[in-house]
Amino acid sequence: MQPLLRQVHAAVAWLLVGSIVVQVWLAGTAIPQFGGTGNFETHRNVGYLIGLVALVLVLTAIPTGLGRRRILQSLGILGLYIVQSSLPYMGVNAIEALHPVNAAVMFVVSLVYARAVWRDRAATAAA
């Protein structure tokens, strides 16, 4: 059962990475200087769905048997998401401006994590 759970977990990790790429694209299409309307509603709504993916990442990490380290790493990604969704509402422009910076950090951390759990999955399948 664990090999299947590890495959599901790896797929969720890659889904998160892909979702972040789509989210950045949605933000770019809304920016008026790039021809957008200035309406970030779709970007915001999809962002909330990404939170569900991040939560599923944590929930699927627990039964995989990959250990405490992977569970804590997935919790860290969820933490980055919580920060990400809070930044636009801080009320201080200098802090709100960290929203795209945190998005980049979340993307890199999620990408590194997805690659690692993909390798973990492959190692389990080969054994």
Q: What is the role of each PLM region?
A:
Residues 1-127:
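Polytopic transmembrane helical bundles with strong interfacial aromatic enrichment
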